[in-house]
Amino acid sequence: MKKLLAAAAVAALALTGCASGGNTETTSDDNTFVVGMECAYAPFNWKTSEETDTSVPLGSSGYADGYDVRVAQYIADELGMDLEIKTISWDGLLPALDSGEIDAVIAGMTANEEREQGADFTTPYYDSEGMIMIVRKDSEEATYTDIQQFSGKNVVGQKGTNYDDVIDQIQGVNHVTPKQQYGEMIVALQQGDVDGITAEMAVAEGVIAANPDLTVVQFDEGKGFEADTTVSIALKEGTRDSDSSKKFRKL
């Protein structure tokens, strides 16, 4: 939790620099911190009909909750601003940031070379236990210990994410067209349309808890995927070079 809040503090200061002369402009009033997320990626962010101590209203359509919502609320509190969560599809998040529709993307997003061409990222606020595979519990794949055993199998990942990119590390895999959300992939797995779903452990634990017919394949050391599994906050390009942001990174 300390690591989470420290990273949130960095982002808060970066945004303070933005508010005092940076280039971020949003459609909301100056006292509202607008954050974009899918609200479909538990435990990082999800939509619920029930209000909790950590949830944030989504207009008249329920509430946003999760790890990312807590980070967003912390930053808003540090800035002395109101928090507004906008539900945006994964592939629309960075365009919304660039256009000024939102102030930040806090959505379980990993910084990579392509994304850094159009946005600035804070230091990571989360590092997962690594990338794994979700499979049917009663399947042969549940006994696998090496990603190469999925050669010839149908494997799917979420569109526009590292989880889709890494599938090609499996030689001879049938790389299924990626899906927008995990819900679609889970249905495909349960119906036998795919043999495995790439994911990180934090996400997989929630999937398994809700779907006891599924299980997780954790690979032996040196036999798994090679991927960056850290999560950072995306800010509008140029924000991270502000003087206030540089001061915060010394904390």
Q: What feature does the model see in each segment?
A:
Residues 34-35, 54-65, 146-161, 175:
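Short loop->beta-strand "edge-of-pocket" segments that line small-molecule binding or catalytic clefts
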Residues 12-17:
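C-terminal motif of bacterial Sec signal peptides marking the signal peptidase cleavage site
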Residues 25-109:
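Extracytoplasmic small-molecule ligand-binding "clamshell" domains
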Residues 67-69, 85-95, 142, 177-191, ...:
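Short helix-initiation/N-cap motifs at beta->coil->alpha
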Residues 127-135, 209-249:
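Periplasmic-binding protein-like
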Residues 82-149:
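Acidic, polar ligand-binding/catalytic clefts
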Residues 92, 109-118, 166-169, 195-227:
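A ligand-binding cleft/hinge motif common to bilobed small-molecule-binding domains
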